[in-house]
């Protein structure tokens, strides 16, 4: 399992996160081509190596050519609300998963800003976050995570300084109110450093909060790459954020956190329920199932249960609320143990077919990939069971004789 760990010993900001991710070895040319899909004019991005405290780091600078320039080409003051930013993202040619994550991060920051300024989330205007450089930091981070193809993201506790900083709202205490709002009622551990300035920005915390599934020490893993992203402030210490990329040290059961969405339905056409299930799976649900239940007034109905990770939760909630007759959804956070899984290929008389390998210590088990077997059965017009038999036979050859059937 490929793991990314954010080591935020000196806090976190958007440019530090982006710099550390690029420092892991992402091709800057490919990154810039992906970023061009944002279709946002008026800026250049400079990515260069520098040295801080004798350590090589990557420094990212977004160079704004004009005071502000919307994607339409018209000039505006650099204050955008959430709808403005979502419109830019929706009208871009970015990948769908990059769009979803970018909007999720902006929504998290907007929620915090709206709360501290006593405004609705629709009325709050971004200043720092609405500026081009912060948009690039957030969307750029989503692009990097897509390019890295990690399975799990973890983070250290969040670190911040003390004192006051000057910003568009005047002189504010550190941590700034939006940061405290995002930390409130979260499971994110927070540490105050003896540094008289801001270390943790709303953009930095918003990104980490939305992508990390756990906070704490680095999990056991073999380290593949380490990246450092430069901070801009002079803090009197090594001001950088570190990203560590690696693989799970052992192929064992993984303690995983998921969200369970449930709702009871007794007034829907069952044909539509089947359609809803397909849509939920297509949009990232880990599992979807219906359970027969008896509801009030002795009505037979179904309990719809959807298992999802954090990344896809919001989209799946939208689908349930728009596609079904329900008026509400119950949400439960659950822990689960999962065997690590890898896709392998097995050589059969019908050619190579994928199998799922799951591991627990030295114990391994294999299961044929249904879609591959179905495709072979349909193309060759043979029983599906015959394809399964061929795959299972090849697996036995590998296990019993240790031949090179799996690659």
From Swiss-Prot:
Example GO BP: protein maturation
Q: Which GO terms describe its molecular function?
A: lyase activity; nickel cation binding
Lineage: superkingdom? Bacteria
InterPro entries, per the entry: Ni_insertion
Supply the alphabetized keyword list. Answer: Lyase, Nickel
Q: What class of enzyme is it?
A: lyase
What chemistry does it catalyse, as a reaction equation? Ni(II)-pyridinium-3,5-bisthiocarboxylate mononucleotide = pyridinium-3,5-bisthiocarboxylate mononucleotide + Ni(2+)
As recorded in UniProt, its EC number(s) are: 4.99.1.12
Say what the protein does.
Answer: Involved in the biosynthesis of a nickel-pincer cofactor ((SCS)Ni(II) pincer complex). Binds Ni(2+), and functions in nickel delivery to pyridinium-3,5-bisthiocarboxylic acid mononucleotide (P2TMN), to form the mature cofactor. Is thus probably required for the activation of nickel-pincer cofactor-dependent enzymes.
Q: What is this protein called?
A: Pyridinium-3,5-bisthiocarboxylic acid mononucleotide nickel insertion protein
| Species of the source | Acetivibrio thermocellus (strain ATCC 27405 / DSM 1237 / JCM 9322 / NBRC 103400 / NCIMB 10682 / NRRL B-4536 / VPI 7372)
């Amino acid at each position: 399992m490929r793991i990314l760990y954010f080591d935020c010993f000196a806090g976190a900001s958007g440019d530090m996160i982006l710099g550390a991710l690029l420092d892991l070895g992402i091709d800057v040319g490919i990154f810039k081509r992906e970023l061009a899909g944002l279709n946002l004019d008026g800026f250049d991005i400079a990515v260069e190596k520098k040295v801080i405290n004798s350590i090589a780091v990557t420094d990212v600078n977004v160079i704004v050519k004009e005071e502000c320039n919307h994607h339409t080409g018209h000039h505006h003051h650099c204050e955008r609300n959430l709808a403005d930013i979502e419109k830019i993202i929706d009208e871009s040619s970015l990948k769908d998963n990059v769009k979803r994550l970018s909007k999720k991060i902006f929504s998290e920051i907007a929620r915090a800003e709206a709360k501290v300024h006593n405004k609705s989330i629709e009325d709050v205007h971004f200043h720092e976050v609405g500026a081009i450089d912060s948009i690039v930091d957030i969307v750029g981070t989503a692009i990097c995570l897509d390019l890295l193809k990690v399975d799990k993201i973890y983070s250290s506790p969040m670190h911040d300084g003390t004192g006051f900083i000057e910003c568009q709202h005047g002189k504010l205490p550190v941590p700034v109110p939006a940061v405290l709002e995002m930390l409130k009622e979260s499971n994110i551990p927070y540490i105050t450093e003896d540094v008289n300035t801001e270390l943790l920005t709303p953009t930095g915390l918003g990104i980490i909060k939305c992508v990390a599934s756990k906070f704490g020490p680095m999990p056991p893993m073999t380290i593949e790459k380490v990246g450092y992203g430069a901070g801009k402030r002079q803090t009197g210490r090594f001001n950088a954020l570190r990203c560590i990329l690696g693989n799970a040290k052992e192929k064992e059961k993984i303690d995983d956190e998921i969200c369970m969405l449930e709702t009871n339905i007794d007034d829907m056409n069952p044909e539509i329920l089947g359609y809803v299930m397909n849509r939920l799976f297509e949009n990232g649900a880990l599992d979807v199932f219906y359970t027969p239940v008896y509801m009030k007034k002795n009505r037979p109905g179904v309990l719809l249960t959807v298992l999802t990770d954090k990344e896809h939760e919001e989209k799946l909630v939208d689908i349930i609320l728009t596609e079904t007759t329900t008026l509400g959804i119950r949400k439960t956070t659950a822990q689960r143990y999962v065997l690590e899984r890898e896709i392998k290929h097995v050589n059969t008389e019908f050619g190579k077919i994928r199998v799922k390998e799951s591991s627990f210590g030295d114990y391994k088990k294999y299961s044929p990939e249904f879609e591959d077997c179905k495709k072979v059965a349909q193309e060759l017009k043979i029983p599906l069971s015959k394809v399964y038999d061929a795959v299972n036979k090849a697996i036995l050859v590998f296990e019993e004789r240790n031949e090179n059937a799996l690659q």
